[in-house]
Structures are given as C-alpha cells and as structure tokens.
Swiss-Prot record:
Its main location: membrane. GO terms for biological process: monoatomic ion transport. This is Solute carrier family 22 member 23. It comes from Rattus norvegicus (Rat). It is a multi-pass membrane protein. Glycans are attached at residues 24, 274. Residues 165-177 have a biased composition (Polar residues).
Amino acid sequence: MAIDRRREAAGSGAGRQPAPAEENGSLPPGDAAASAPLGGRAGSGGSAEIQPLPALHPSGGPHSSCCAAAAAPSLLLLDYDGSVLPFLGGLGGGYQKTLVVLTWIPALFIGFSQFSDSFLLDQPNFWCHGAGKGTELAGATVTGRWGDMGNWTSPSATPFSTASWGTTSNRSNSSDTPPLPSPPGKGNNDSNCECHAWDYGIRTGLVQNVVSKWDLVCDNAWKVHVAKFSLLVGLIFGYLITGCIADWVGRRPVLLFSVIFILIFGLTVALSVNVTMFSTLRFFEGFCLAGIILTLYALRIELCPPGKRFIITMVASFVAMAGQFLMPGLAALCRDWQVLQALIICPFLLMLLYWSIFPESLRWLMATQQFESAKKLILYLTQKNCVSPESDIKGVMPELEKELSRRPKKVCIVKVVGTRNLWKNIVVLCVNSLTGYGIHHCFARSMMGHEVKVPLLENFYADYYTMASIALASCLAMCLVVRFLGRRGGLLLFMILTALASLLQLGLLNLIGKYSQHPDSELQLKLAVGMSDSVKDKFSIAFSIVGMFASHAVGSLSVFFCAEITPTVIRCGGLGLVLASAGFGMLTAPIIELHNQKGYFLHHIIFACCTLICIICILLLPESRDQNLPENIANGEHYTRQPLLSHKKGEQPLLLTNAELKDYSGLHDVAAVGDGLSEGATANGMKTM
C-alpha cells in the first residue's frame, strides 16, 4: 500500500500521461516535443531518435527537471494539425481555400520563366549572309529545355554553318549513330565559320532570339551555354539563401522581396545591350525566382491538413505544366525575344497584391513561439471564416493567452547538423533529387540523339511537346502510385525504374552490338549490323522515355517528401537544400554542352551508380503519409524508420516502438522496500529457509 501511494503521488506530481500512441513511427506533434522533459530519457531504446538538449536557464545553467515542463510551450499549441487547424475550420474554411488558390496562380508564371530558355536561347540553323536559306546546312542544334542534340545531316559544298559545335555525318548511311560534335574551329567547321554575318532560321516561332541578336555562333557559341547556366546558378543560390531567410524572418517578407526584385531584374533583362549583361541579369532573375518558388511551396504545404497536402501540391505542378504547354503559343504571339521576356515577367505584378491579401504562415508563427502575432492572425482568420469562439472545444485561445509572454524562438537550418536522424533524411533526399534531375538529361540527350532516324523528333515542337508530355504522364502516375504505396514506396518504385532504364541502356545495347560483330558471312554481317542498329535505336528510345518518366517523378517526389519531414521551424531551409541539389543536377546539362559533350558517357555512368545507392538509402526514410507535419526539431527526430511492409497481426516486431516500451520507473521503490525488510523475510513476506 505504501508503494502504491508513493507511485500515485509521483504520478500526480509529475503530471504523467499515458504513453502516446504511435503511428508509422512518429509521435503526434506536441507529444514528441515534450517527451524528453516529461519522461527523462524517453525512447532511449528507439533505433532512430534523439532528444532535445535541455533549455538554458536565464542565469546560464540548465533548468532543473522540475522546471523543464514549465519551460516547454503548451502541447496543445504545438499540435497544430490536431488542435489549431480544426478550430479554424481546416481546409473547409473559405479563407483557407482562397489562400490555396492564390498559391496555384503564380505557378503558371513560374512555368513560363522556367521554360523560357528553350525559346530565348535556342540555337537556330544559320548560314552565311547572302547565301540564301535554300543552301542552309542543318547541323547539330540545341533544342528543348535540356539542351538536347539532333538534326545531323550531310555537309554541303558551300561555306555555311549551323552551331559551331555541331558536326556532320553522312545522311545516306542511316545505320551510323550520329557522332559527338567536334569543338569549334576544328575539322570541317573551319570553313563554316569564316563568315562575318549570318542569316538565321529560328525554329521556336520567334523572329529574333538572343543567339541571333548577338551572333552567338562559332567562336561565341560557348556564351549560349554560359547564359543557360546563369539562370540555374541563380536558382541554386536563391534556394539556399532565401530558404534560410524565410525561416528567420518569415515566408511573407521573402515572397514580397522576391516579387519586387524579379520585376526589376526580369524587365531589365529585356533591355540588355550585350550577352554579358543578359547573363548577369538572368542570374539575379533566377535568384528571385527561387525565392518565389520556395516560399509558395512552403506556404502551400503549411496551409493544408495531412490528407490534402499531396494533391494540392500536384495541382500546382499541373498549373506549372500548363505554362510549359502554353509557352510555344506565347512565343509565336510575341515574335521577339524582348517582348516575350517582358510578357513572362509582367504577370508577377499581380503578386504585389499578396502583401495585403496573403497573411504570414500561422503554422510558422506558432512553431517559432510568436504567440502575440499568432493570436492576432487567429482572430483575423476566425472572423474571415465566421468561426464562433464557442467552437474552440480544445481551448486553444485560453492556452494561447497563457503563452503570450514567451519570447520568439527561431532556428536556422545549420542546427540540423546536431541531430541524429533528421540530417540523414535530408541528405538522402538531396542525393535523390540530384540524381533524378541529373540523369534526366542523360535520357533526354539519348532520345534526341536519334532524331536523324526518327523524323518526328526533327521538329522543335515535337521535341518540346514530347518532353512536356512525358513530364505530365509522370505526374499523373505519381498521383496513383503515391496514393497506394505512400511517399517512400512510390519514391522507391520510381528510383528502381530509373536504375533499370539506365543500366539496360548502358549495358544491354552494348551487348547487342558486341554479338552482332561476329557473323559467318558478309551477307550476315550486313544483316546483323542493320538489325543491330535498328534494335538498338528502338530499345534506346524506349529506355530513354521510361528513364525520363521515372526520373522526373523521383525529383518531384524528393522535394515534396522533404517538405513533409522537415520541421516547420527549418522547413524552408530544408526545401532550399533539396531544390538546390535539383538545380545542381540540371546544371550538368549546360556544363557538358559547354565542353562539347566530352565526358557525357562517364556522366551517365556516375548517375547510374547513384541510382543504385539511392535505392538502398530510400529504405532508411520514414513514411509521412497522413502524418502531422513536425513543428520543431524534436518532432522531426521522431519521424523514425519503419518496415516497408507492416508485420502481420499477432507478430511481435523485433524492435519495440516507444508506445510499447515498458515503464520500469517504480523499480527503485521496490528495491528500497526490500532493503528495509528483515534478513529472514523477502519482499512478499515469505520466510527464508
């Protein structure tokens, strides 16, 4: 009885609650944050958890255990998805729906900007001025978003040229694979670049683009590739820097800052007087565009309840693809690259109204303990949604009133280095994103390398819409796969498809060519070579389409996965890392082209090996489907790895979860009682022999 009374007194004094239920390896927000202060070393038996460091006392030392619970904010306020969002009406609230739609609209403008390089910097066919278009030499050109190659035709006797790095091949020998282009100023291109003025055959619907305006051909052709990766480098730096700033000052100020400066730099790009000015301004345009993409992505995720996050994100992707599909018509309407650039940027003027319409992320305000601002925003949202105070069943507002005196607590992404699991998850997703977007160019170049033998692919619009259609099909398939397999299962499936397509393209096609080179007769040699090349071309195109399909899904799903498992306090920083990794993957395309395709095969080999590594690493990720978003780093640490397939009913898992761990906190009481008993009696009162 004395033991029971001591246990009851200890339980009531510490405010001990029953162990929280655990689903898919994560604790509900709030419970995970306070598990360490309430239970000491709670979850020390888990395989992938770390507890937060004790809060510092104002005098400089750590709080005592009796003050740790008082230092932590209310668990109710940390449970945003379970308490605050339902109080505001969830996504059913009319104002929240309006905000979600407002995050979709700019995706159309973003789609225009992301795919503008295909039109502004497309390398047209060109010939010496006065030679006439009838004598045009259609050589290697760069088409599409990924800078793909094609259009190899036979050389002409007249000294005119296409892009300086283009090469020629014998059109009549259709069985020969088009060779890699030779560097400018070497071989047959010496005579083709002796002109001082050129005429251009632009294929993108424009009368003039950047290449034709400043004659970026022959010795100046390398400037086209520099201009291409200036936008990508700006995006990479923008993701990294604006992500950290958005976690510190908020999503709304970064969004407004990015909109204002993209208007300034974007419109100035249209007034460029030389290619150096164009490339420099495109860097800053990409920097600001990254801020818009990142903040809208984070706001969209933070507005939604768990069950709606993925579909709302995919709708935004479809809107951006609509911009990709509309871009050729927009170019044909504008006719001039300067008008096209201005028309792409001007719609961002509408986003200046977002400062008065779009509020700061309430989830971020609550996670960073800015409760004074959060209270004002909650009152504003309840008024907009016509929510009565009586609907506050869980008592969010009374708890908020108690916490108004707290000081804001903001976190930088560098804090993730001190975690145990969170940094691993982010690194895995960064590698996945880098691999997905990097190998996409390998598949695209391989498919466009067969343009000579597939007449459909010789047309710019066929190239462009083929790429866009593959991306659209990938997103549609991703919606179905993620619904049934979850985030981790879907990512694993698409990565396996990417690896298979890459390895089969690299290995199987070479194997076919190897065994076709040892026939018994000359006739069999001709048949074998023809059959080999025909089969190789068909297989190569098929593997390229499958690879582009799967790699696009890998890149997109990696970004979304990161947005879900990264805590709110550092969500923009984590998103910035993964998006920057995607930018590095896309950056490999113009770099390889700048070096005249040297090292392309090694480039493909490296990314193919990365896919195999990623398949293993994906198994280490948690599953975030239908989970509440983690609000702080402690919540993010409790997103632990679980088996890909759940165990059957009645089976005991080898590793117990936190909810199944036994409580042995009363053992010291039993030991104390045992020490007080006489030597001749045991703890249950039985006499010893």
